[in-house]
Design a protein with these regions (language model features):
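Glycan-recognition and catalytic cores of secretory/periplasmic carbohydrate-active enzymes
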Residues: 1-480
Length: 480
């Protein structure tokens, strides 16, 4: 199984040590090698983009072919962040392909995202994704086929029940050298091959799609698209994230209560901890890509609901079900990361960030109570509680928050320039000069007549505002 929270933790570990005397290059190596092997192997759909659920072999060649929204949202964010951290275009290409698949295959007309693509079609596992050399040769022609087959193992023995599931077998430079062509020409042949196979595959019977639209899983997709939109400079990804957030706000938020699921025109089931926490976290990422006072208000409503309806006021942390949910024999309070991040970990992480953004101690105190309640679990089993450890890191060393006020174009340019840096503990918000009254501490981050102004704070400590990009860039460089 992919473990995005663990790989994210490694990237954060490297970044936190990078400016010191002993940068943790092992953490960076482990993260980037894992991401490369995942993208080279059979987990990744090399034709259509997106990741399958898990590998069934130790070499990560053959997957269980089901594609889950809750995997692809976090993996999209992770590959985009890896691109920022390393500048490696391969990570950007994987992120772009994953995002393209999410938008083309998984986003509904209403704006939300569907839950899954099944593994089998026509009664066979993986049939939709498999090829034979003869099929590919006929589609590509001999010259492009020679390059494509060498790259993706079609010149090797079949790897899945007499057919070929594409995995990267050789680096492009070796493929080009063997074919006697320039590396750029080899890359072009590979891309032509992918497009030809994608077109041919569109004529096959696709796996069934589970068209439930789940609040928690949509939140993971919104977060991934918002992060990738900033990192890859793709406004279409931000547009898609905004559409999904608006779908949830208009369709799943009824009578001031969030619902968990939508299908066939009906929103159902009271939402759980994960729905509220994941969506709060996603909105904080989306606000950095595109400011919206409505989305900030929605985030505040979700945070207040967490405290009022989910918090264990006696022991700290958050229950999975709300106070008015049907009574259970045991009311769980999940702490560990599983197939999705820990709801308690994301709640603590996002509440801290919102608390520092607004100067709201209620959120900071609730996050601290959660971390104290989870301390024994983190201490005894740290690799099972990585999301909580990340929240603990930001509790011990507060997040850096940059507020940029001014005219839209200029504030956007400052924000976009700041977003080119991999700084996982930094939040950058560009808020227009004419934005209506802002809540909490944001009210003190006023626009200045005639100038763009930036306010930089570390936790509750704020520097003097600056009115030039050069001054802000110098401040950001010092904090890296």
């Amino acid at each position: 199984f992919p473990h995005p929270t663990t790989i994210d933790r490694l990237l954060r570990q490297w970044r936190g040590s990078a400016s010191g005397d002993a940068p943790d290059l092992d953490a960076l190596y482990m993260a980037t090698l894992t991401l490369t092997r995942m993208a080279d192997g059979g987990l990744f759909d090399h034709v259509g983009g997106g990741f399958c659920r898990y590998s069934v072999d130790q070499y990560w060649q053959i997957p269980h072919f089901e594609k889950m929204l809750y995997d692809n949202g976090p993996l999209l964010a992770l590959y985009a962040q890896a691109f920022l951290a390393t500048g490696d275009d391969y990570f950007a290409a994987v992120a772009n392909a994953t995002a393209d698949w999410m938008l083309s295959d998984m986003q509904s007309p209403q704006g939300g995202f569907y839950a899954t693509r099944d593994a089998d079609s026509e009664g066979e596992e993986g049939l939709y994704y498999l090829w034979t050399p003869d099929e590919v040769r006929e589609l590509l022609g001999e010259a492009d086929y020679a390059v494509f087959a060498s790259r993706f193992g079609l010149d090797q023995p079949a790897n899945f029940e007499g057919r070929w599931h594409l995995t990267v077998h050789r680096p492009v430079e070796e493929v080009a050298a063997d074919a006697g062509v320039a590396e750029g020409d080899a890359l072009a042949a590979i891309e032509r091959g992918k497009q030809a196979l994608l077109t041919a595959r569109a004529g096959r019977v696709p796996p069934e799609r589970d068209e439930k639209q789940l609040a928690a899983w949509n939140a993971l997709a919104i977060r991934g698209l918002a992060i990738a939109g900033r990192a890859l400079e793709r406004e279409d990804l931000v547009d898609a994230a905004v559409r999904a957030a608006e779908f949830i706000r208009s369709t799943l938020f009824i009578d001031d209560r969030l619902l968990a699921s939508y299908k066939d025109g009906e929103a159902r089931f009271p939402a759980y901890l994960d729905d509220h926490a994941f969506l709060l976290d996603a909105l904080l990422e989306l606000l950095q890509a595109r400011w919206s006072s409505e989305h900030l208000h929605f985030a505040v409503t979700l945070a207040d609901t967490l405290l009022e309806n989910f918090e264990d006021t006696a022991g700290g942390g958050f229950f999975f079900t709300a106070n008015d949910h049907e009574e259970l024999i045991h009311r769980p309070k999940p702490l560990a990361d599983e197939s999705v991040p820990s709801g308690n970990g994301i709640a603590a992480f996002a509440l801290q960030r919102l608390g520092f953004l607004l100067g709201e101690t209620r959120y900071l105190d609730a996050a601290a109570r959660t971390l104290r309640a989870a301390w024994r679990a983190m201490d005894e089993y740290p690799h099972g509680h990585v999301t909580l450890l990340t929240a603990l890191e930001e509790y011990l060393g507060h997040p850096e928050i940059v507020i940029i006020r001014g005219d839209g174009d200029e504030t956007g340019r400052w924000r976009d320039a700041a977003a080119k840096l991999y700084a996982p503990r930094r939040l950058v918000f560009a808020i227009g000069r004419d934005e209506p009254s802002l809540p909490g501490a944001l009210a003190d981050r006023a626009a200045v007549d005639g100038d763009t102004v930036a306010y930089r704070c570390l936790g509750t400590h704020c520097e003097l505002p600056v009115t030039s990009w050069e001054a802000l860039a110098a401040s950001l460089s010092e904090s890296n």
